[in-house]
């Protein structure tokens, strides 16, 4: 690596790395380091009147206070932080004091991983700590972490830029308290849900992510190509159609928690790669599924938070079952004053115009209704609410309503103004299903790029017979947002999709060399901030000379310095 690409701290740390090796200390040892305790457990289990407990711990050194022959550090392991008391003569009992005087005091840096063996005690200030008897270097950090300080519940020098936090999640997890807890809770959400399903006897399965037809949802897919078969394939947008095939095959209840991919926009609640759970249970309907869903979410909330109430932004959301039920057309009538019951597409278009909505000719009846609900109703449902009985045009995979053939037996659960889950009494009439697919193809021909493609193999599966079935899909990322009180999806994804990092534009070396600059000086000039020839045009030759000669000296490059006149001639040649 070019030394000019490193900061002063990075150079110092690399020099320390080399010094450790010269002393015979491997900064990245291969052997297992055996630990027997975590910081939080040590504190929780400590008793003043017991024989001091011997422990072996490992983690990052996050702070250090050196006071001559004795020092305090703060060690951070996977569960928390604990203070360690280190004295020269305890970790260096013999004549050789290098481990303390040289390694600990000078060559180790904040962020380094170390192992500590010692006993637990309480300091005079009352803090439970470890008295170190042995220190082991486990991994050297050659890039300094941001130093975030905490005192009396106040955070100082915080690492809080969202762009940096999401792009460098490893740093975010290491230095920001509370971030790791979000992902621990996410894991508990998954465990609780699986426990609920497994207790009912339903089986977890896996279905293809690469699919020949992107079916099961109305969304734009990512497309790829299989070279050996020479066919296009799609990253799945939903697992629905494959899971229903398993119900056809004889399983009574199946579920899958897996990744879906939709080639659409990114915002506070959408990521192109997201996790979804879908479950299908034979011989059930959407009424049963509503009760099943609210009990599931209540259980998850209790398991994760110990209560059914969660604060999300300014709202306190109560996940205690049962949840309110409102029909979709009833919701639209309540919030707009228009009753869409029995209206055709043109009549609904007129309603949209009266509501001053932006619509276009590609939108069919179902899309128009969906737009009305999204604009005027969805955001009003803060407490968990089932929106039921969707118009048939919006639900190509859903069974017709038993009492009204213009509607379907479908519900969506709205929480905090957003859809959380979607469920049906599944359409199992193969003739009706094929007709619905054909209607979707007509929408596609009109320009609706989210219309579903006909999956003939799925229709064939239905022709063999699928029992009455109810299915439900839930966005695991949004569920985690709610259970952890987060307002953006990026906060609950370890590595959310990010736009490419901005790269500072730089001219090639040849452009600088056209001015008479030797190639070896180009990196120095760019290190000084003159990344393009044009950046030098208005600069004072004296200042420019000081800048580049200063870098030559600071980094000990031992280049022959140009004169001020040489620099002035370079600048004069810039057109």
Swiss-Prot record:
The keyword Ligase belongs to this UniProt entry's keyword annotation: yes
Signal sequence range: none
Cofactor(s) needed: Mg(2+)
UniProt-annotated location(s): Cytoplasm
CDD domains, per database record: LysRS_core, LysRS_N
Catalytic reaction(s) noted: tRNA(Lys) + L-lysine + ATP = L-lysyl-tRNA(Lys) + AMP + diphosphate
A GO molecular function held by the record: magnesium ion binding
Cofactor binding mode and count: Binds 3 Mg(2+) ions per subunit.
Chief location bin: cytoplasm
EC number, as in UniProt: 6.1.1.6
Quaternary structure and partners: Homodimer.
Family statement: Belongs to the class-II aminoacyl-tRNA synthetase family.
Record PANTHER family: LYSINE--TRNA LIGASE, CHLOROPLASTIC_MITOCHONDRIAL, LYSYL-TRNA SYNTHETASE
Protein name: Lysine--tRNA ligase
Record organism: Bacteroides fragilis (strain YCH46)
């Amino acid at each position: 690596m070019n030394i000019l690409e490193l900061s002063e701290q990075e150079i110092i740390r690399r020099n320390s790395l080399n010094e450790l090796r010269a002393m015979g200390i491997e900064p990245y040892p291969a052997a297992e380091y055996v630990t027997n305790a975590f910081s939080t457990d040590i504190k929780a289990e400590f008793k003043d009147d017991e024989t001091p407990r011997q422990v072996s711990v490992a983690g990052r050194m996050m702070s250090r206070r050196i006071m001559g022959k004795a020092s305090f550090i703060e060690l951070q392991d996977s569960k928390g932080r604990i203070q360690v008391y280190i004295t020269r003569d305890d970790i260096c009992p013999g004549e050789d004091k290098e481990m303390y005087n040289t390694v600990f005091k000078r060559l180790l840096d904040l962020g380094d991983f170390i192992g500590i063996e010692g006993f637990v005690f309480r300091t005079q200030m009352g803090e439970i700590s470890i008295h170190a008897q042995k220190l082991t270097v486990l991994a050297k950090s050659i890039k300094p972490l941001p130093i975030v300080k905490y005192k009396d519940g106040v955070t100082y020098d915080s690492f809080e830029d969202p762009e940096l936090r999401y792009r460098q999640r490893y740093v975010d997890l290491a230095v920001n308290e509370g971030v790791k807890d979000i992902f621990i809770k996410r894991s508990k959400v998954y465990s609780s849900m699986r426990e609920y399903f497994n207790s009912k006897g339903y089986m977890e399965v896996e279905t293809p992510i690469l699919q020949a037809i992107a079916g099961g949802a109305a969304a734009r897919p990512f497309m790829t190509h299989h070279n050996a078969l020479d066919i296009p394939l799609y990253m799945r947008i939903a697992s629905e159609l494959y899971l229903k095939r398993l119900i056809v095959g004889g399983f009574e209840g199946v579920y899958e928690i897996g990744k879906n991919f939709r080639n659409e926009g990114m915002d506070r609640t959408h990521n192109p790669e997201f996790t979804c759970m879908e479950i299908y249970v034979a011989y059930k309907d959407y009424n049963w599924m509503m009760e099943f869903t609210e009990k599931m979410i209540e259980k998850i909330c209790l398991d994760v938070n110990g209560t059914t109430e969660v604060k999300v932004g300014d709202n306190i959301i109560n996940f205690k079952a049962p949840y309110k039920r409102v029909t979709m057309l009833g919701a639209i009538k309540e919030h707009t004053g228009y009753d869409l019951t029995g209206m055709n597409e043109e009549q609904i278009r007129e309603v949209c115009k009266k509501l001053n909505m932006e619509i276009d000719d590609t939108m069919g009846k179902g899309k128009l209704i969906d737009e009305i609900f999204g604009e005027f109703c969805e955001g009003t449902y803060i407490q968990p609410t089932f929106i039921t009985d969707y118009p048939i045009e919006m639900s190509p995979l859903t069974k017709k309503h038993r009492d009204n053939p213009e509607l379907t037996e479908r519900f969506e659960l709205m929480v905090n103004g957003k859809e959380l889950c979607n469920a049906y009494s599944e359409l199992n009439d193969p003739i009706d299903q094929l007709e619905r697919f054909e209607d979707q193809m007509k929408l596609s021909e009109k320009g609706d790029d989210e219309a579903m493609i006909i999956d003939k193999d799925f229709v064939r599966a239905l022709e063999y017979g699928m029992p009455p079935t109810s299915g439900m899909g839930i966005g695991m990322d949004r569920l985690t947002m709610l259970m952890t009180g987060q307002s953006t999806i990026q906060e609950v994804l370890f590595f959310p999709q990010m736009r490419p990092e901005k790269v500072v534009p730089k001219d090639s070396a040849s452009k600088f060399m056209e001015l008479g600059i030797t190639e070896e000086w180009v990196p120095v000039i760019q290190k000084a901030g003159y990344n393009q020839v044009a950046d030098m045009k208005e600069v004072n030759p004296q200042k420019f000379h000081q800048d580049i000669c200063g870098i030559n000296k600071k980094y000990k490059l031992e280049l022959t310095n140009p004169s001020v006149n040489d620099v002035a001639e370079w600048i004069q040649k810039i057109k």
